[in-house]
């Protein structure tokens, strides 16, 4: 007897739901799945160059690139790598990450990270991005400010007035000529663990645009008072600054100039490291203004190796297996098979890798499509033959290069 696709997923595939994203876009949701084992070398390289480079190498900036021979430079996992590195840091104020990078125990420092991204709607400049980073620190799954407040309150002997004074003293120590700490921000933080997040949620879009740097500066003062020595800011979608029509040429130059300001003035110069995502289109659009402001080079040439990490996508089938398993494992039920990629069979891995050109985001989207197709067809397992038939019928395989090393040879006949 035929069942609906979702019942088939539950009972035949052993999955409570389709775990894969229905769009090839990183959502940033707390439930987004991640495994360091998908890109172990790139993950280690990124954290080494950004974190250890920021702590011990004197680096203030770093760049996470994606590149592919086809010229398709999105969907490689830059956003996910940044987000999950920030989460790994904030889990224990960077202790485990630093230990894994080989930093000696005596040199491990308390650090935090924030993630924020530009967009073409409300964050098309640096200040609203800094505001979003402050929100990232204050609320949600990556929040550190509630724990920071508890630490400061303990140091102040549960005296809120003393905690207030400690934060003000921190400002005078690290940036005596810097921006003043906003009183509304300080009051909200001192008042309760959730006070800062609640305050920030009510700030108008206009104020975020004008005053985002003030809120972020205040966060740095608060973190410094608690003994945090470095903040790692991960900025995604920098290419939106250079998109045609997003900003006028004058405004784009101003926004890029603000990045330079943050490398030179306190409290940012000594307490902040910024990482940016890049690809070829972003580099072309931003190069002129970037160079005019004499910002650190984002070039991928060997001379700049200490500041640049390049993601080149999924190169091996074991990476595809690890990626699929990371997403499926949380939703497996008592009907699940013993294979880590069940209901897929191993010959599907190469097909998905070739079809996506190694781009993790695209691969997960195609896996979602294929899983639903298998459930709709009521198959017991999803093998290579089913995958080839499905994708050929939708015209996807025609775009895959026949020379792809492993999977391409299996279905050259479909590429004619």
In which residue ranges do the predicted regions lie?
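Short beta-alpha junction loops
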Residues: 67-71, 114-120, 278-282, 367-371, ...
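Active-site-proximal structural scaffolding
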Residues: 78, 252-255, 356, 363
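A short, basic N-terminal segment
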Residues: 1-63, 88, 95-96, 103, ...
